[in-house]
Amino acid sequence: MKKILLTILIIITILSINVMAVDIDIGEPAINRGSTASTYTWVNIGNPANGSGTITSIEIWASTALTNCEVATFYVVSGNNLSTRDSELIGSVIANSKQTFAVNLDVQAGDYIGAYYTVGALERDSSGFVGCWMNTVDRIPCTNVLFTLRDGEAISLYGIGTTGEEEAINSLFFGTNF
């Protein structure tokens, strides 16, 4: 009888372990780079979102302190015309190190990550990457706005998140979301 109860307890324990969410990542690493990006709206083209769900954390590296920094997920309407899917104000960002912020941004597979700030500069590389889109004014939020393509560039803006698949998997096994 003890063996049966122990076996049942082990099975319940194994089944109640929360299944880890599948990670989403978007953007280029938040690192010290060779140039800077002034107060425009910048969108990384490299490393579009590899899944749909929620971006929960943003990493950013400013070369000079940022003020009124907004981050957003963008999608291509056509050509170099972009729209925002979701955005969030993260506020001030201190300079010269990677800073991490908790966010709650909707994202779809293939989306891009971008930022705008009223003061300061992001770390930027001017060559060796896929590129960035840039617009000279605040385009967070925006709908079907033309951006300028900057080939080879990258800004230090990166996000990670979850697909929300853990809830679906748990509900399959247990009949409810955890």
Positions of the model-derived regions?
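Short proline/glycine- and polar residue-rich coil/turn motifs
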Residues: 90-97
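Bacterial N-terminal signal peptides
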Residues: 7-16
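Short alpha-helix capping/helix-loop boundary micro-motifs
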Residues: 99-101
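Viral virion structural and adsorption modules
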Residues: 167-178
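Positively charged n-region of N-terminal signal peptides that target proteins for export
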Residues: 1-4
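Beta-sheet-rich sandwich/jelly-roll-like modules and their strand-loop junctions
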Residues: 20-87, 103-112, 116-167
